[in-house]
């Protein structure tokens, strides 16, 4: 942001003059965020203090062992703290209320020891205005546990381990990567066994695998506590509790710290777009009213997700959500967030039954939820002020302009957005088109169709495509032959040959052309067979598909290891040449007849031959920089399960003659269904 940029939030218009007709709407949006920042400054002493709500609310223990517990519940007319410590006596520990509906109780220590034992059950009980006595899990609780032998309903526990049992972080956060290469993972499925895997197993088994593959970021799903395992973590009950299914809070801290020791940043998949509608172990109807943290009536219900919608324009809701982000950064050492369901937060229609044409009126009209936009801008402003290296990623299908520009320019402040159109394109191609009918121009357009100056994370597939009812790319490509012909002892059938070739090419073209970051969902890097289906009534609570068969890459008689090694080579080559943080590619050729795509990015020359049957000898390719080129990545390499049709030692010499708008050309042999990345010899 330059010093000459306007300070009224209209700087984005200088970057994109097509936004000029919406100047007033942009300025109004900016002013609304500024008014909230001013309110927080005046009333709360600034975003720093405001986002530390967990130091005031919930349970806090002093150095001397005194406990203070506070809860916002304005609809309650009585409140008391109950638990194992007082035999659930509703009269033993009454709470007092202030003028803002905040209930409080102080419990002095006995002989320097907290009166509530560590890991013992607690709840708040309230009497509502209708006279009903209710029991609730504290909203800011840091640990809840579930015993399915007793009930599916979670129980809240007072978590205050002795100092000797607390995890002490040993390693500093790594610097924010210039090129973000994300490995998306779910702790519970990270094992070939038919059970829930643990934080400790992830630390021991998955972190070395992710590091070996060359990723520099991990995105952890389903960490915020959720009662329904099959929700994939997207129906959150307890926002400050790390899921107890996988182990203790200390185990998650060890996971993050160990990742940091390996140079890996860790992002939390944060769900602030909605909340579980559970009453007994969630936030819903917390104080007996339907409008405490959420909008009342139908406005507070998400009809597709069957969940509750936050009221982002409420002061205490903002405190709760901003403090939640801060808590995960401070308590667990996360390095940033992937915000789930951002489209639902940005619009009052929540994206339901609404397509986006890309017309700017859709982003600045009456359908925009001003409070949702304000909260996201405030969240990004707080995070980036306090943690300059914090990484935020938005999951938005609408394509809202300025989502990934700073608030000062009039943006919402995210670092990256997910390129959600890319995986949809691949599924459409594989479902509906024969290989001869692939539209190379449309492929290139979809991969490069992103807003200038706003960073995008490209991916060929994520967890969405792995879920039951959908198929991973490898399943679309190979189908039932995955079960019979992925052994090197069986015939290399045309189906498997095509599947492996396109699996590598699709990933490489996405990585090289599609964005400023790259994401892969665990297992998909090696073509994991089958889909994901969590234990539920519809499958007899089976874990058979709720696991990742990561052992498949360790069997040298299976072809999965070739895809795994290719993925590693792709990440390591990016690490060396840095195309993800280089300017967008220059595309010099999109040949529909030959099915050839050629482009340059980060001083590498990329050549893709998607033709299903034709190989080309001495194919002339334009290139800007003169010199001698060598192969740095070849999808047909035998090390990656290819046919090895290209001599890796070949030197390609440029000719000083313009070709396809480039100053020079060179000639290459490009076999069918093969992609090459060439680099100048002196960079090897």
UniProtKB/Swiss-Prot annotation:
It catalyses: Transfers a segment of a (1->4)-alpha-D-glucan chain to a primary hydroxy group in a similar glucan chain. The keyword Signal does not apply. InterPro entries: A-amylase/branching_C (IPR006048), Branching_enzy (IPR037439), Glyco_hydro_13_cat_dom (IPR006047), Glyco_hydro_13_N (IPR004193), Glyco_hydro_b (IPR013780), Glycoside_hydrolase_SF (IPR017853), Ig-like_fold (IPR013783), Ig_E-set (IPR014756). (1,4-alpha-D-glucosyl)n binds at residues 88, 123. The active site is at residues 340, 395. The keyword Glycosyltransferase applies. Belongs to the glycosyl hydrolase 13 family. GlgB subfamily. This is 1,4-alpha-glucan-branching enzyme. The lineage of its organism: Eukaryota, Fungi, Dikarya, Ascomycota, Pezizomycotina. The gene is be1.
């Amino acid at each position: 942001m330059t010093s000459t940029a306007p300070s009224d939030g209209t700087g984005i218009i200088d970057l994109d003059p097509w936004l000029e007709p919406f100047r007033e709407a942009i300025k109004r949006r900016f002013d609304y965020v500024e008014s909230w920042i001013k309110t927080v400054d005046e009333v709360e002493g600034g975003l720093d203090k405001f986002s530390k709500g967990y130091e005031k609310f919930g349970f806090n223990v002093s150095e001397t062992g005194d406990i203070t517990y506070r809860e916002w519940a304005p609809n309650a007319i009585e409140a008391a703290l109950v638990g194992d410590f007082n035999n659930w006596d509703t009269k033993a520990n009454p709470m007092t209320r202030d003028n803002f509906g905040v209930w409080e109780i102080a419990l002095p220590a006995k002989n320097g020891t907290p009166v509530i034992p560590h890991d013992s059950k607690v709840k708040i009980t309230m009497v509502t205005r209708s006279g009903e006595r209710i029991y609730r899990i504290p909203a800011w609780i840091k640990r809840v546990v579930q015993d399915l032998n007793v009930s599916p309903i979670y129980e809240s526990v007072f978590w205050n381990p002795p100092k000797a049992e607390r995890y002490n972080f040993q390693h500093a956060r790594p610097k924010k990567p210039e090129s973000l290469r994300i490995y998306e993972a779910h702790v519970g499925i990270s094992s070939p066994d038919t059970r829930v895997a643990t934080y400790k197993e992830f630390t021991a088994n998955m972190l070395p695998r992710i590091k070996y593959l060359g990723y520099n970021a991990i995105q952890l799903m389903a960490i915020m506590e959720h009662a329904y395992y099959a929700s994939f973590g997207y129906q959150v009950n307890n926002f400050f509790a790390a899921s107890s299914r996988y182990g203790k809070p200390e185990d998650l801290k060890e996971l993050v710290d160990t990742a940091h020791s390996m140079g890996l940043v860790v992002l939390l998949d944060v769900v602030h777009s909605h909340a579980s509608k559970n009453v007994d172990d969630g936030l819903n109807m917390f104080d007996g009213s339907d409008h405490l943290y959420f909008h009342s009536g139908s406005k507070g219900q998400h009809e597709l997700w069957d969940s509750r919608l936050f009221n982002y324009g409420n002061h205490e809701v903002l405190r709760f959500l901003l403090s939640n982000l801060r808590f995960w950064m401070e308590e667990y050492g996360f390095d940033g967030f992937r915000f789930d369901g951002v489209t639902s937060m940005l619009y009052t229609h929540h994206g339901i039954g609404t397509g986006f044409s890309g017309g700017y009126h859709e982003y600045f009209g009456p359908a925009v939820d001003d409070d949702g936009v304000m909260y996201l801008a405030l969240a990004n402003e707080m995070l980036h002020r306090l943690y300059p290296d914090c990484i935020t990623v938005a999951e938005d299908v609408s394509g809202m302009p300025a989502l990934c520009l700073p608030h000062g320019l009039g943006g919402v402040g995210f670092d990256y957005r997910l390129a959600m159109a890319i995986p949809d394109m691949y599924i459409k191609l594989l479902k509906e088109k024969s290989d001869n009918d692939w539209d190379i121009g449309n492929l290139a357009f979809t991969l490069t169709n992103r807003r200038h100056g706003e960073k995008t994370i490209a991916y060929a597939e994520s967890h969405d495509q792995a879920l039951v009812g959908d198929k991973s790319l490898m399943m679309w490509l190979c189908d039932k032959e995955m079960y019979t012909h992925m052994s090197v002892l069986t015939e290399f059938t045309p189906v498997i040959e095509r599947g492996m070739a396109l699996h590598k090419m699709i990933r490489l073209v996405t990585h090289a052309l599609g964005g400023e970051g790259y994401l892969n969902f665990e297992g998909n890097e090696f073509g994991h067979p089958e889909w994901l289906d969590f234990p539920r009534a519809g499958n007899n609570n089976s874990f058979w598909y709720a696991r990742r068969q990561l052992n498949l890459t360790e069997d040298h008689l299976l072809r999965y290891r070739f895809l795994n090694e290719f993925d590693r080579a792709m990440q390591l080559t990016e690490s060396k040449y840095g195309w993800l943080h280089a300017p967008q590619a220059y595309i010099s050729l999109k040949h529909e007849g030959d099915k050839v795509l050629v482009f340059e990015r980060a001083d590498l020359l990329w050549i893709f031959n998607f033709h299903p049957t034709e190989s080309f000898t001495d194919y002339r390719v334009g290139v800007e920089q003169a010199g001698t080129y060598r192969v740095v990545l070849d999808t047909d390499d035998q090390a990656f399960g290819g046919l090895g049709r290209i001599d890796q030692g070949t030197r390609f010499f440029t000719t000083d003659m313009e070709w396809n708008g480039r100053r020079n050309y060179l000639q290459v042999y490009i076999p069918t269904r093969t992609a090459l990345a060439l680099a100048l010899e002196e960079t090897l």
